[in-house]
Amino acid sequence: MDPRSEVLLRQAELFEGELLLAGLPADDLLGLLPQAHGWSWHAGDQAQLAARFAGRSRFDTQMPEGDYRAAVLFLPKSRELTDYLLQALASRLTGRPLYLVGEKRGGIERAAKQLAVYGKPRKLDSARHCQLWSVQIEQAPATPDLDALAQVYSLQLADGPLQVVSLPGVFAHGRLDRGSALLLEHLDSLPQGHLLDFGCGAGVIGAALKRRYPSSRVSLLDVDAFALASSRLTLARNGLEAELIAGTGIESAPGELAAIVSNPPFHQGVHTHYQASENLLTQAARHLRDGGELRLVANSFLKYPPLIERHLGPCRTLAEAEGFRIYSARR
């Protein structure tokens, strides 16, 4: 059981009846709160919740419809995303309580101050290195317009400017990270065919691929609903079309790919997880056609080449700059 869920269950009498759990973990909480519903933007968590509690959790960037007597937000990492989610929840809770739960090292005390916009925050509990806060919504705010919160920036690429649209909560929100910047400089000479941007974020790599290889089918895969929404906006902004896939990892990718191109993710909340990246390296061969290529950017300190060579083939370093390397291997 997630420690945040355990903190909620210490006050179980507060969470009876129709309740919305936003950003909930994939644990037993829905089973222990039989009238609660979930709102998830993590495809992996949603898949587990859907398998165990069919019809009780929704994967989306928008608050699910329903008449909830209360809502709980499990604190996300991004302050901007927290602002959006709190406003979305508060907009439907006039005269009702909104709860915020999170880990101390995740910044719950700082985030609790964001509740003050809606009323006087109260700390209800502190246990398992987590805190539970609440606020009674005195006057509901307007429903937030997610698209209006997007940040747009322009990249000057060799084949012309590319507009990137970034929503709150997406990796490197409102800017181009150094790893992706290096990868954008090394997208030439990829095999023709079906191309995948794995861990697409705001869609910068996928959009660049589609423009560079217009006759190729391009797919963008991410675990996060806000990333996929950002990618959709980025593609539309540049007049491009590509397939978007909500997936838990490389196992969700299509087969017979000509190339997998990636700035693979390794952050989840306040924790660092390399599992999705390592799965990409160990399983890429299953999704590539003969002669298909894996091309990725990674921090130089990560020992990826031995893993790539063990599971795919000889690994070449195409470039190195500012603590990052571009690796390439073919099946």
Curated annotation (Swiss-Prot):
A single GO molecular-function term is: nucleic acid binding
Q: Name one Pfam family in it.
A: MTS_N
Instruction: Show the CDD domains listed in the entry.
Output: AdoMet_MTases
Cell compartment(s), UniProt: Cytoplasm
- Its signal peptide is none
**Enzyme's top EC category:** transferase
- What GO CC annotations are associated with the protein? cytoplasm
Q: Alphabetically list the UniProt keywords.
A: Cytoplasm, Methyltransferase, rRNA processing, S-adenosyl-L-methionine, Transferase
**What is the reaction catalyzed?**
guanosine(1207) in 16S rRNA + S-adenosyl-L-methionine = N(2)-methylguanosine(1207) in 16S rRNA + S-adenosyl-L-homocysteine + H(+)
* EC number in record: 2.1.1.172
- Among its keywords, does the record have Methyltransferase? yes
Annotated function: Specifically methylates the guanine in position 1207 of 16S rRNA in the 30S particle.
| HAMAP family cross-referenced by the UniProt entry | 16SrRNA_methyltr_C (MF_01862)
Regarding protein family, the annotation reads: Belongs to the methyltransferase superfamily. RsmC family.
- Assembly notes: Monomer.
Q: What is this protein called?
A: Ribosomal RNA small subunit methyltransferase C
Q: Which organism is it from?
A: Ectopseudomonas mendocina (strain ymp) (Pseudomonas mendocina)
